[in-house]
Amino acid sequence: MALQTTGILDDLIARGYRYMNTSNADNLGAAPDGRLAAWFAASGAPYSPEVCLRTPADRKGGHLAIRRSDGRMILRDTAQTPDEDMRWFTDEHRHRFFHTNNLWFDLVALRDALAARGGLPGLPLIRNRKHVDPSDPSSPEVFQVESALGAIVELFDGARPVLVPRERFLPVKTTDDLALL
């Protein structure tokens, strides 16, 4: 994680910073919010992802779940879900909350969690099938490999999701999305 390997994480802590909020650059609803910052600081949680109530439009988005094998909270993404489980994954009544990728971190807890793992968060890889030219389905198929920072939830005991209003999640993926604003 770049914050740790560059020394920035230790530097922030040494300068007295304790909390950090991150979000996706394309989420125009992810503005700083003093009330959320105060809640997070008072909560004592090491990590808190913002979640919204899920709608049918969010069927493909990630959500939090409890892993059966060890009871840990995890972030599940569409690309990580087997086809036979997709009907459950997309059920907004079963999984009521949508993960916004607005994340709150206690920097000391983040430093300690990374140190306990040799500096590597060990985030699960997500494999997405794509075409070299997205507008041409006959172009060669490739795999895009990525990880989601929100998956870091499984590193923290005591992570506490916080339900936020939908206005905190306004992703802009296309020019049409931008025009709607």
What spans do the regions from the language model cover?
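Active-site-proximal specificity loops/subdomain of glycosyltransferases
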Residues: 1-5
